[in-house]
């Protein structure tokens, strides 16, 4: 689900998606942006967790919708980066104009291949530069550059536009201002808790994805009505709670309502 987080009024849920449990979060991001723009609700920034971020969709959001997606990108998967030692991919100098990759020791790769398409719709195309065993074997710091016994190494990276976006996004994440801005995203966890524990959203009341989605949409509408009636625009709002009807006295003999359906 997607909600506003401007801080100057009640947070309003603007989009709800119902997907199979086996689907990945990255699959839904383009559809969310398309629906928000169609409704006239396009945000300048969209704060998401790491499950939604991939280079392809970050670039697509900027290009097609002028939306800046703010969220942590997956880390570099190379062995050197995971271990925190040796020469990771970002230690290599990439020259897109000359189609050359230079290692930290000054060796220029012998090949530039691709970009190759990947099997995943959310994965960026991959360019591969190869360093041969004749370059790696005599290197005095070979252990830092490759784990291959013969000294060869392949260095993979996305095309220029995506590579520059990747570097810029990772650099911004190291800035204190980025963390301050991104901290606002944690508020959606309170909304998820409100849906799950206050409205029984962990359990579908109907069979079929279409009916389940209708349940989710109607519940979101009910939550919006409750929030807007409790905190009209312009008034400061209280933190999101998981209670169905917060603020009302509830004697011990009257248990909390499990969902909006129970109140009908």
Could you describe each region identified by the protein language model?
Residues 1-264:
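Anion-binding and metal-coordination hotspots
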